[in-house]
Amino acid sequence: MEFPFDVDALFPERITVLDQHLRPPARRPGTTTPARVDLQQQIMTIIDELGKASAKAQHLPAPITSASRMQSNRHVMYILKDTSARPAGKGAIVGFLKVGYKKLFVLDDREAHNEVEPLCILDFYIHESLQRHGHGRELFQHMLQKERVEPHQLAIDRPSQKLLKFLNKHYNLETTVPQVNNFVIFEGFFAHQHPPARKLPPKRAEGDIKPYSSSDREFLKVAVEPPWPLNRAPRRATPPAHPPPRSSSLGNSPERGPLRPFVPEQELLRSLRLCPPHPTARLLLATDPGGSPAQRRRTR
Ligand SMILES: CC(=O)SCCNC(=O)CCNC(=O)[C@H](O)C(C)(C)COP(=O)(O)OP(=O)(O)OC[C@H]1O[C@@H](n2cnc3c(N)ncnc32)[C@H](O)[C@@H]1OP(=O)(O)O
C-alpha cells in the first residue's frame, strides 16, 4: 500500500507501534524532519487508508479502524512496512494489527458468566497482494511478545474465516468456548487469567459500567440501538408486518433488528436477571416511579 509521502522515513522500524497519541516515531539521524503536525497528519492518513482497506477486505459497511477512533480509544496498532519493495523510494505499508483491552462478560465451559478484561484482537489486515506470505504471523508474533500474552489468552472480535484458519495454523487454536456475544475465545482461556486478563479495579459506580461485552463492530449495525436483550420487540396483540428477527442461540451473536420500543417492564426485569446490568436499563428503572429499590438490586 503506497502513499504520496515517504513512509520509509516516517516509520524507521519494520514494525511501528502506535497508541492513541499517534506520535510520530523518532526519525533516523540525518533525515530531514518535517513539522510534527505534518508527520501526524501522514500517520492519520495511513491509519484511515488501512482501516478502509481492512473494512473492504472483510465486507464491512464502514471501517472499524480510523485515526479518530484510535484517538478516542486506548487501542494499540502494530503497523508493518515493506522493507523490500520501495516504489519511488517512498516505501509501502504491508498491513496492521489492532488490539485493545476490553471488559467482557464471557461464558466458561459450564456456561457461567465471568467478568474479565482480556487483550482483544480488534482488527487485522494484510494487503491482498501479500497475504499468505507470513506477514500476518510476523505482526502477530511481534504483538504477542510486546503485550506478553499467549494466543489462548486472547479474545477475538468476530473473527473472519481467514483469521480462524490463521489462528488454527500458527497457534493450534481450534476449540472455541461458545459465547453469546461476538467475541471468540479458545480452550485454555480460563486456565491462565493473570496475565493478560487485567485485574479489574474495585467495583465501579454503576454509571461507569459499559454495555454487555460491546464489540468494536457494534456501531456498524444500529448506532443508537440498546444492546440485547433490551432491543427485543414488545409482545404485540396483532402479528407484526415483518417476521421477527432470528432468535439467538448459545455461541451465536444475538441477531439485532432495527431500533424498537423498549420491552414492557415485567419482561425487561425478567431479562435483566439473566444478564449484567446496562446503564439504559438503570435509567429506565430510575425514572420509573413504580420501580422499588429491591427490584433494582435484582439487576446487579
Ligand atoms: C478480528 C479481526 O480482525 S477479523 C478480520 C481478519 N482480517 C481479514 O479477514 C482480512 C483479510 N485477511 C487478511 O488480511 C490476512 O489473510 C490475515 C490478516 C487474516 C492473515 O495474514 P497473512 O499474512 O495472510 O497470514 P500468514 O501468511 O502469516 O498465514 C497464512 C495462513 O493464514 C490463513 N489464511 C490466510 N489467507 C487465507 C485465505 N485466503 N484463505 C484461507 N486461509 C487463509 C491460512 O491458515 C494460511 O495458511 P496456508 O496458506 O498454509 O493455508
UniProtKB/Swiss-Prot annotation:
Keyword tags: Acetylation, Acyltransferase, Cell junction, Cell projection, Coated pit, Cytoplasm, Cytoskeleton, Membrane, Methylation, Phosphoprotein, Transferase
EC number: 2.3.1.108
Asymmetric dimethylarginine carried by residues: 282
Catalysis: reaction(s): L-lysyl-[alpha-tubulin] + acetyl-CoA = N(6)-acetyl-L-lysyl-[alpha-tubulin] + CoA + H(+)
N-acetyltransferase domain boundaries: 1-190
Modifications the protein undergoes after translation, according to the UniProt entry: Autoacetylation strongly increases tubulin acetylation.
Primary site of residence: cytoplasm
Residue span of region Disordered: 229-263, 280-300
The UniProt record lists the keyword Cytoplasm: yes
Residues noted as binding acetyl-CoA in the record, renumbered to the chain: 124-137, 160-169
HAMAP family reported for this sequence: mec17 (MF_03130)
Function: Specifically acetylates 'Lys-40' in alpha-tubulin on the lumenal side of microtubules. Promotes microtubule destabilization and accelerates microtubule dynamics; this activity may be independent of acetylation activity. Acetylates alpha-tubulin with a slow enzymatic rate, due to a catalytic site that is not optimized for acetyl transfer. Enters the microtubule through each end and diffuses quickly throughout the lumen of microtubules.
Protein name per Swiss-Prot or TrEMBL: Alpha-tubulin N-acetyltransferase 1
Organism expressing this protein natively: Sus scrofa
